[in-house]
Amino acid sequence: MSTVNVLRYSALGLGLFFGFRNDMILKCNAKKKEEQAQYEEKLKLVEEAKKEYAKLHPVVTPKDVPANASFNLEDPNIDFERVILNAVESLKEAST
């Protein structure tokens, strides 16, 4: 009779242990899933805010300067990218 009781209580203990473990795993997975959903919602709101900001504050691009325009290289606000690109364009036009 004692062996039967040992087996019975051992099975009960194992059942409680695995039940508790399974419950904790399920709760942890549910919590992670909820946090991921909240994070995705925040990302969605950030993207919407970026789109709205882009609508309210459009990017102003400087107008293209003709290739034959002269530049003041002493100007502290000179756009070197534009100067170089215009020089390359003028060289392309001259070679064709």
From Swiss-Prot:
Biological process per Gene Ontology, one example term: protein-containing complex assembly
Sorted UniProt keywords: Acetylation, ATP synthesis, CF(0), Hydrogen ion transport, Ion transport, Membrane, Mitochondrion, Mitochondrion inner membrane, Transport
Domain of life: Eukaryota
Keyword Acetylation carried by entry: yes
Subcellular location: Mitochondrion; Mitochondrion inner membrane
Pfam families in the cross-refs: ATP-synt_E (PF05680)
GO molecular function: proton transmembrane transporter activity; structural molecule activity
Residue spans crossing the bilayer: none
GO cellular component terms, semicolon-separated: mitochondrial inner membrane; mitochondrion; proton-transporting ATP synthase complex
Comment field (misc): Present with 4590 molecules/cell in log phase SD medium.
Family named by the database record: Belongs to the ATPase e subunit family.
Oligomer status and interactors: F-type ATPases have 2 components, CF(1) - the catalytic core - and CF(0) - the membrane proton channel. In yeast, the dimeric form of ATP synthase consists of 17 polypeptides: alpha, beta, gamma, delta, epsilon, 4 (B), 5 (OSCP), 6 (A), 8, 9 (C), d, E (Tim11), f, g, h, i/j and k.
Functional description taken from the UniProt entry: Mitochondrial membrane ATP synthase (F(1)F(0) ATP synthase or Complex V) produces ATP from ADP in the presence of a proton gradient across the membrane which is generated by electron transport complexes of the respiratory chain. F-type ATPases consist of two structural domains, F(1) - containing the extramembraneous catalytic core, and F(0) - containing the membrane proton channel, linked together by a central stalk and a peripheral stalk. During catalysis, ATP synthesis in the catalytic domain of F(1) is coupled via a rotary mechanism of the central stalk subunits to proton translocation.
Full protein name: ATP synthase subunit e, mitochondrial
Organism: Saccharomyces cerevisiae (strain ATCC 204508 / S288c) (Baker's yeast)
